[in-house]
């Protein structure tokens, strides 16, 4: 797809994600199989040809703002955590990241935020909080919440045995 067309895609809508592939990758990792994770060029809005090999581990962390939108994916997750961040802080982080890392202008970021980011957040991301087992407020700066999550993960991950 030409760059001019890729720029027009709403990447904040769940349909823009390859959720079936992500779900299959999670299934494979849970089954003890390595996967080849696609790589993306966010500055140019495209999936690259190369992949990154991911080996299975005792704990698998899947992150993304739209992961709770898919029931099939939710069913593969043992713990679902939603990190709730103030909207102003989310916008500032996006503005800084997109200018610094993706070559965007301030106006481009503002336009995208108004046109797609905020509406999609309100339609898909915010309502998906209801599927979370844990909601951590303060954008991850909540030490008590984070400590509780760490303890829960440790309780689920088998301890290595001494040989």
Positions of PLM-derived features:
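Conserved nucleotide-sensing/catalytic segment adjacent to the nucleotide-binding pocket
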Residues: 1-44, 59
């Amino acid at each position: 797809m030409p760059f001019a067309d890729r720029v027009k895609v709403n990447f904040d809508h769940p349909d823009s994600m390859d959720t079936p592939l992500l779900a299959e990758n999670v299934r494979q990792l849970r089954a003890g199989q390595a996967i080849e994770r696609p790589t993306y060029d966010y500055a140019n809005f495209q999936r690259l040809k190369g992949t990154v090999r991911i080996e299975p581990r005792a704990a698998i962390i899947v992150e993304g703002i739209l992961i709770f939108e898919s029931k099939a994916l939710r069913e593969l997750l043992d713990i679902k955590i939603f990190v709730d961040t103030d909207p102003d802080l989310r916008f500032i982080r996006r503005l800084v990241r997109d200018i610094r890392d993706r070559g965007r202008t301030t106006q481009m970021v503002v336009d995208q935020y108004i046109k797609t980011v905020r509406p999609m957040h309100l339609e898909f991301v915010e309502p998906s909080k209801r599927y979370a087992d844990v909601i951590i407020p303060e954008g991850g700066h909540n030490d008590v919440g984070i400590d509780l999550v760490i303890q829960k993960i440790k309780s689920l991950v088998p301890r290595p045995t001494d040989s």
